[in-house]
């Protein structure tokens, strides 16, 4: 019996040792026994991956490379930035994403890859042991030397998209992979294309997002996990600081720059920007807080939207209270009202509201915090005007509205005059957030397939940045999110970073 227990213990230890987690990946290993051993190292300071690998190639009937991967089922999106280090020896050294049936060297796979000479392709082996052919077993991109690679599985279909910094994703091709099992390996890889030479590469902003069908309703059909992220808007580097299987939303950056504030389960929480355990903020009798909460420009007060039982259309009501917590003071009697901004002088709150007696449309209103009449600023008879936010100098209120047929960004003077459209593209653009230095507008863009009057959960969305002074928007992030991602102001006090929420499956009922 002792001998049997000893053997079982050794086998158990072997199984544990065989798994080598790195960052978000449960394992990394050489595939195909390359002559030169590879490695994957996770840098916690910036959440990047340093890859090193040998390997003759990923081609013909078998492969050699280094692989960091997870087992995953169902539909998913893989997105990352990639860079090969140095000039390299072989022009076909390669780095990218791979989805693989197994860790066998002849396994079926789908590989989205950029080579040392800039060649960018979707390559595949449809059956185990099949001999990969050129050009039959790859889809070519006319664009070369890309940095951002995305590979999506949608049922049996695989879609590859690419971009460089600032660009929207461009689809280069799609193909089916009927022979790949539901459970696959998915991860980042590196291959030197020369068995006698190691090569190195980097991957950052590495994201694996499990998706749900477009018909999924985030209120009705279950929620996905939430990730709280911080991003430098100028270099695009992202950091995940907090994760939860439940739903949290809409981070605000606290005035000291050291903490974030967000809502979850009807309550308000704060968390250090390095991560840690969230702390609940006392909001008194307001127990059903939604994702419309805003910190005053002087950093002393918090405005919130909280639901009142028995009131029309959900009863969302605007309140304010000390940022340190305390008893809320009600501002809006009529519902629904959804807060989006303080005035810079702290005397008014501006919000979107539906007033059925005036119009079925949602319009923008403002009201003094210490009492006074509600003032209507937009007068749309149909559709939606939402997300009003004062510029730091108090000269403009930025907002989004869909009277042109798509949701676009607008601005107006604080009295509602001088309305002018700012964006003119095919996306549905929501929630203009102005940097504290009054130089930049960060906002979220939904795809053309979304109803212009809706900003639902769990969609393929973009975060974009444009100058306040005018100019074309550029993409700063690709993510799976939407409602709750960036509904309210989320700039850091130094105007260099924003905070936002992204989502991933599986579904939690």
Across the structure, where does each feature detected by a protein language model lie?
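Extracellular glycan-recognition regions
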Residues: 19-217
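Bacterial Sec-dependent N-terminal signal peptides
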Residues: 1-21
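Short secondary-structure capping/junction motifs at helix and strand boundaries
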Residues: 2-4, 19, 90, 327-330
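Detector for intrinsically disordered, low-structure N-terminal pre-sequences
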Residues: 9, 15-16, 30, 349, ...
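Sequence signature of WD/YWTD-type beta-propeller architectures
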Residues: 213-509
């Amino acid at each position: 019996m002792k001998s049997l227990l000893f053997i079982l213990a050794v086998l158990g230890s072997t199984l544990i040792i065989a798994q080598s987690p790195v960052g978000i990946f449960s394992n990394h290993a050489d595939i195909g026994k390359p002559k030169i051993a590879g490695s994957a190292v996770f840098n916690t300071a910036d959440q990047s991956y340093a890859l090193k690998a040998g390997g003759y190639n990923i081609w013909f009937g078998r492969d050699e490379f280094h692989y960091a991967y997870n087992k995953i089922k169902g539909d998913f999106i893989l997105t990352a930035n990639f860079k090969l280090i140095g000039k390299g020896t072989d022009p076909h050294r390669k780095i990218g994403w791979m989805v693989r049936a197994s860790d066998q060297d002849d396994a079926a796979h789908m590989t989205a890859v950029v080579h040392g000479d800039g060649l960018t392709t979707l390559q595949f082996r449809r059956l185990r042991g099949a001999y990969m052919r050129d050009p039959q077993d790859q889809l070519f991109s006319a664009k070369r030397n890309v940095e951002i690679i995305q590979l999506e599985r949608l049922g049996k279909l695989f879609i590859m998209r690419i971009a460089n910094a600032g660009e929207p994703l461009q689809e280069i091709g799609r193909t089916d992979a009927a022979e790949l099992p539901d459970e696959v390996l998915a991860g980042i890889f590196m291959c030197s294309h020369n068995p006698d030479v190691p090569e190195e590469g980097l991957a950052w902003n590495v994201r694996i997002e499990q998706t749900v069908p477009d018909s999924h309703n985030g209120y009705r059909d279950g929620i996905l996990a939430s990730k709280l992220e911080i991003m430098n808007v100028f270099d695009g580097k992202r950091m995940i600081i907090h994760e939860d299987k439940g739903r949290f939303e809409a981070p605000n950056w606290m005035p000291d720059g050291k903490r974030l504030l967000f809502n979850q389960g009807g309550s308000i929480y704060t968390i250090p920007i390095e991560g840690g355990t969230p702390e609940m903020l006392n909001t008194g009798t307001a127990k059903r807080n939604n994702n419309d909460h805003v910190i005053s420009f002087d950093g002393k007060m918090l405005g919130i939207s909280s639901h009142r039982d028995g009131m029309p259309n959900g009863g969302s009501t605007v309140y304010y209270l000390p940022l340190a917590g305390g008893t809320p003071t009600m501002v809006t009697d009529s519902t629904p009202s959804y807060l989006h901004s303080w005035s810079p002088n702290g005397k008014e709150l501006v919000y979107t509201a539906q007033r059925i007696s005036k119009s079925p449309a949602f319009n923008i209103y403002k009201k003094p915090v210490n009492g006074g009449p509600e003032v209507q600023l937009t007068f749309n008879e149909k559709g939606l005007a939402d997300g009003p936010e004062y510029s730091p100098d108090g000269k403009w209120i930025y907002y989004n509205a869909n009277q042109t047929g798509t949701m676009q960004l607008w601005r107006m003077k604080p009295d509602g005059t001088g309305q002018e459209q700012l964006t003119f593209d095919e996306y549905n653009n929501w929630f203009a957030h102005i940097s504290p230095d009054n130089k930049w507008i960060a906002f979220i863009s939904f795809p053309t397939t979304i109803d212009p009057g809706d900003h639902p959960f769990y969609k393929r969305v973009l975060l974009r940045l444009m100058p306040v002074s005018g100019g074309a928007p550029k993409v700063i992030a690709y993510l799976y999110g939407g409602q709750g991602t960036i509904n309210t102001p989320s700039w850091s006090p130094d105007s260099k970073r924003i905070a936002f929420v992204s989502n991933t499956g599986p579904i939690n009922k």
